[in-house]
Amino acid sequence: MNKLAILTDYFGDIILVQFEYFRPQSEIRKLVSSYYNVTVSDDVSDVMRAEIANLRFVIAGQVSADLNGAEEQYGPGDTLLCGPTYRWSHVRFTPGTQVFGAAITPMGWARLFDVDADQLADRLVPLEAYVEPSTLPLIQDILDAPDETQRVTAADRLFTAMVDPARRIDEEFLDQVTAWIASPEPNELAVLISEMSRSQRQIERLCKKYFGSAPKLLHRKFRALHSANRLTWQDLTDWRDIATTVYSDQSHFIREFKQFNGRTPSEFIKGAHILVRMTLQQRLQIDHESPFSLIG
């Protein structure tokens, strides 16, 4: 059953949003850790925070986003590959818009796409340009599915077909960095380097390849996302409860928080944040094979 949220915008007007998460089939959960479906009944404008890589299938309506530097519109049938993002962006939905999405883990990116993650970081691109022609009918099956149960099944078929088991992947590195990011405080970069039998140059190169950025930026991003998650999941009303000593001062914390979440901590607590708040709440409703889709 869809989660129906009755929310209000800054002007007190009621906005209806349906949001639900789904688990992919077990064989691909390390690659695609969750699916989601969102439907909005009215015009909705919001800020999207920095995210992990994902796919978005526009089922109905129209979505506008400025992640690529200028506002672009996407309509029914558009399928978008979004690399890992390291900054916030604006998004807007017209009434009746429905979007189906999939969260892609770093392992999933390596198995599914023949392009380094940093090449598509902070970018929205057509999915069709990065998949084999033989998979295009499977993409259409997702768009044409009559309900969410069949859409999830169609998505499972698509991602299963996209997997390249022969591709060489440094799974040990992926696991080590994932564990580091899952709890980034107080695990600074020096901690990661000290625990790996690799040079700093190797770590930088592999982080860009699999995670979309150098480790320092990756750490800053997830530290800020963790802070926002705690505000939501613990229902905190004072941002100072999550401002830890790893920041040089309060101004540093506020700047970092806003860079990746799109709002200051106080604005995050008091503002509408329809999409971010709903996604964070709904993520807790399913188990996540990878902590990446839960945190980011």
Segments (PLM) and residue ranges:
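HTH DNA-binding helix-turn interface
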Residues: 206-215, 257-265
